[in-house]
Design a protein with these regions (language model features):
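C-terminal helix-rich "cap/oligomerization" subdomain common to oxidoreductases
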Residues: 1-2, 48, 72, 268-269, ...
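Redox-cofactor binding/interface segments in oxidoreductases and associated redox assembly factors
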Residues: 2-3, 26, 108
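N-terminal glycine-rich "phosphate-gripper" loop used for MgATP/nucleotide binding
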Residues: 4-8
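Charged, glycine/proline-rich intrinsically disordered loops and linkers
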Residues: 33-61, 170-184, 245-267
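Predominantly a Rossmann-like dinucleotide-binding segment in NAD(P)-dependent oxidoreductases
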Residues: 71-185, 318
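Contiguous beta-strand/loop segments that form the cofactor/metal-binding neighborhood of enzyme cores
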Residues: 137-245, 278-292, 309-310
Length: 324
């Protein structure tokens, strides 16, 4: 069962699928706080007033319930994090393993000009803003990379602490000309920056932002003790184009969130391949067929949920938050 449904349905649908003996693929985020513990009929704007520690508690309980129900039923819960399966990420991971180097610092971000759906502007429907919508990708990739690094040495490397800031930076745009980024965010952030401290003392910095014009950027930079890697999911320079005016290529798709065909662009030849979506689907099918776990499983989704909502606690209370 492939769960591509609103966040508030993830837990109930996963539990029903597990009870029916079905393997489960769930899109990110695994779970989110959308007021599921509040009385029915509560106004949309009241959901985001819930204290962030309570949000963390509820979202984690839902994620843990999904993991537990799959285990109890003997089925796999697979977490749809495409970054972990992108060919550029996998190759960097292979080279890092061969080098035996330590990933000391990771910087990852997913940014664009803002979601096209009005539902993304409300906590009630999304469970947060740019942090959960966008930064969840680099967070998941960093956690997976450090976990694999630890396993190669016969040890466990896990996230232990986060610090975070969030803001709606679009509010400042009112001081200038008409903005070209998405505005009108109701009660969610359009920018978030989260720092993870891992148990080996290394760090990861993840950014999610709706303030990026010119198309989506999905990047992860890994600074290791004897090498470094720049993982470019989008844009990448496999193909570059130049057009004098918009519409030069008719209705052809250039890249996600590119607002024009004019000027220099980076049309992606095969976005499903370079983004990792194709490899992710292939990996999930193979994992089920061979009866083996996958790198992006429910446990990874659970960890990302823990990190993100601990980040919201950190941002609200202005302090470091321990994860375990």
């Amino acid at each position: 069962v492939d769960l591509c449904v609103p966040n508030h349905l993830h837990r109930s649908f996963a539990e029903k699928a597990a009870a029916a003996g079905k393997h489960i693929v769930c899109t990110k985020p695994l779970t989110a706080y959308v007021g599921q513990d509040l009385p029915e009929g509560i106004a949309d704007g009241e959901v985001s007033l819930t204290p962030r520690p309570e949000m963390l508690k509820v979202a984690l309980a839902d994620a843990q319930a999904m993991v537990d129900s799959a285990k109890a039923a003997g089925v796999q819960l697979m977490y749809g994090e495409n970054w972990v399966h992108a060919p550029s990420f996998r190759r960097a991971q292979e080279l890092l393993h061969s080098s035996e180097a330590v990933a000391l610092e990771m910087r990852g971000w997913e940014t664009h000009s803002g979601s096209h759906t009005p539902y993304a502007k409300l906590w009630r429907y999304n469970g947060g803003g740019a942090l959960i919508r966008l930064a969840a990708h680099p967070i998941g990739a960093m956690v997976a990379l450090k976990k694999a690094e630890g396993q190669s040495r016969g040890e466990s490397i896990v996230p232990v602490e986060v610090t975070c800031e969030v803001a709606d930076l679009s509010l400042a745009a009112a001081a200038g000309p008409e903005p070209k980024i998405t505005t009108g965010w109701v009660d969610v952030e359009n920018w978030g920056c989260l720092t993870i401290r891992f148990s080996d003392g290394t760090r990861g910095v993840a950014i999610g932002s709706d303030n990026q014009l010119g198309g989506m950027e999905s990047h992860l930079k890994v600074l290791a003790s004897t090498c470094q890697f720049e993982i470019n999911l989008s844009p990448n320079n496999m193909l570059r184009s130049y057009a004098v005016e918009d519409g030069a290529f008719g209705e052809e798709y250039v890249m996600e969130k590119a607002s024009t065909q004019a000027g220099w662009n980076t049309p992606i030849p095969d976005e499903d391949w370079s983004s990792g979506h194709q490899a992710m689907c292939d990996e999930f099918i193979a994992a089920v067929r061979e009866g083996r776990p996958t790198a992006s499983d429910g446990e990874l989704g659970l960890e990302v949920t823990r990190i993100i909502y601990s980040g919201y606690v950190s941002a609200a209370e202005g302090r470091r938050v321990a994860l375990r």
